[in-house]
Amino acid sequence: MQKYGSKKIGATSATSSNKQKVQIELTDEQRQEIKEAFDLFDMDGSGKIDAKELKVAMRALGFEPKKEEIKKMISGIDNGSGKIDFNDFLQLMTAKMSEKDSHAEIMKAFRLFDEDDSGFITFANLKRVAKDLGENMTDEELREMIEEADRSNQGQISKEDFLRIMKKTNLF
């Protein structure tokens, strides 16, 4: 949904683990920053960049894409040339920014649970939140929730565990 005469452009994205669509709006400043990164790495001025240039341009915008992620991104929009144009790049970066926003929201939620700032959600943290929300949950139910999310068997939920679980819920 590109509007050239307006202040913002929107793009819809869906992450592979999250089929829910997220609509974000780019400001003119963000669009300009993306355009500058694209132009900087479009060395030959062809209006297209290849996988290597895509990776460097994404890094310039603050992302750390893996080689496989780059291949997947390009194969999803490539017309056989192995290169993508600015509009495709803009769409990819809008999707990545949307993912970044969702990560920030999940971390914000984590901090609400992690009241003692320990870096973990403990049984006591979970019990407090359940009580604050008026959820009548038994200690056993709360312990089961922690066990379900806790991959390292520490009896508490790490940021990584919380992020993984929240991404599975399709809420973010």
From Swiss-Prot:
Region named Disordered: 1-23
Primary localization: cytoplasm
Single GO biological process annotation from the record: cell division
Keyword annotations of the record: Calcium, Cell cycle, Cell division, Cytoplasm, Cytoskeleton, Metal-binding, Mitosis, Repeat
Gene3D superfamilies referenced in this protein's UniProt entry, alphabetically: EF-hand (1.10.238.10)
Job of this protein: Plays a fundamental role in microtubule-organizing center structure and function.
Protein name listed in UniProt: Caltractin
Gene: CTN
